[in-house]
Structures are given as C-alpha cells and as structure tokens.
C-alpha cells in the first residue's frame, strides 16, 4: 500500500490510450465508500492543460494534506472541466454501496459538460450502461493524473459537505471524521443513537439498537456552501458542474 501511496501519477496511461479517435480522456473517482454516514461522492475531471505548474502536484487525495487538497481543488476547478455527483444515504440504503457509488459516478459524468472519448474509472468495476468507452484501473488514483485529480475534487467536495452536516449534528464530529467509523464516532453512536444521515444497513450502525432519527438536511443548501455550482437534475438530485 505504501508504494502506491508514494507513487506520483502521470499521463502515461492517457498517452498510451490516446489515438486518432480518442483525445478527450476523463478520470473518475469516488469517495465515501467506506463511511458509515453521509453520501458517496464522485467526480469526473478532464485536464486539457497539462503544462500548468499545479499538475505536477496532483496525486491520490489520500496522500495529500487537507490544506494541499484545498489548494489543488481551487487550481483544478479553475483550469479543468469537472462534474460532481452525489448518491444520498437513502439511495445507499435502497440499493447498496457499490450501486450507489456507480450512480454518483454516472451523475458526475452527466454533469461534466464535456463529451468524453474515453473514461478512466478508479477500481475494478465501472458503472454499467455508460455511453462512453470505459477502462477500469485498479489503484488508478496512484497511476493516472486524471483519476488523481478526480479523487481530489471528490474528497474536498465531500469533506466540505460533511463539515456543514456537522453544524446540524455536532455530537458526531463529522468535521473531523467525515462520517467514517472512528472510535470517537462509534462512541457517539452508542451515546446518541443514529441520525438520518447514518447508513443503517452498514454493520456498525445496524448493530446499534438505539435510534435517534433526525430530519435530513436540505442537500442543495448544503452543497451551495461548498463553492461548487449546484443545479438540480430532473430527479431532484443535487449535482455539481463547471462550465
């Protein structure tokens, strides 16, 4: 794992796949898959400008400090084309986390605003039924700069969202744990019970008998605070995109 975390991604795989019919190559990644609270968030990113100084600093979001992620987020969103998609807790409960993560990826791509020739997806499984050519890449956020950029956009967007949720549910310290099952988070679950933002079908939450259902927040209002454009699609789902 350490080897992947320290690896600097590049455009090597993009260049290998580029051809006469493939020029617009988009990276896709998600974050929040293993959390026990909050949505799963995906981002799709197309980097048309490779010579910008910030490009060399892009790497897997997990290998970056929060400060560095925020810095790169601002630079990527200023120069790249991107889309963000959310799959909410009720969708995770209705389907499962894998399906929900694929839903978020589809929404990110649908709101990218760019016609992709090829989509690079982090992981071993891609959403079914995409109208674009797709290639999955295991540990793609450590290999492809396009996927690494998507990991940064998804991570910062979700972290900002969870910090705003923290204002409504301060007992769970989501501003620190971002909805993941830390020891402190689990202790708060035992003490206060679960909220509407907890994933009830996930074992750590399901095992707790006490419940404290709260009204779900207005997602569009929260998303607007992240600094990303947030139109609402035909299903009423909040999405994000950059022109």
UniProtKB/Swiss-Prot annotation:
Residues 232-243 have a biased composition (Basic and acidic residues). It comes from the Bacteria. One of its GO terms (molecular function) is RNA-DNA hybrid ribonuclease activity. It is an enzyme of class 3 (hydrolase). The keyword Cell inner membrane does not apply. Signal peptide: none annotated. It catalyses: Endonucleolytic cleavage to 5'-phosphomonoester. Residues 23-217 form the RNase H type-2 domain. Transmembrane segments: none annotated. One of its GO terms (cellular component) is ribonuclease H2 complex. Manganese or magnesium. Binds 1 divalent metal ion per monomer in the absence of substrate. May bind a second metal ion after substrate binding. It is found in: Cytoplasm. Its main location: cytoplasm. Keywords: Cytoplasm, Endonuclease, Hydrolase, Manganese, Metal-binding, Nuclease. One of its GO terms (biological process) is DNA replication, removal of RNA primer. Disulfide bonds: none annotated. A divalent metal cation binds at residues 29-30, 122. Endonuclease that specifically degrades the RNA of RNA-DNA hybrids. NCBIfam families: PRK00015.1-3 (NF000595). Belongs to the RNase HII family. This is Ribonuclease HII. It comes from Anaplasma marginale (strain St. Maries). The gene is rnhB.
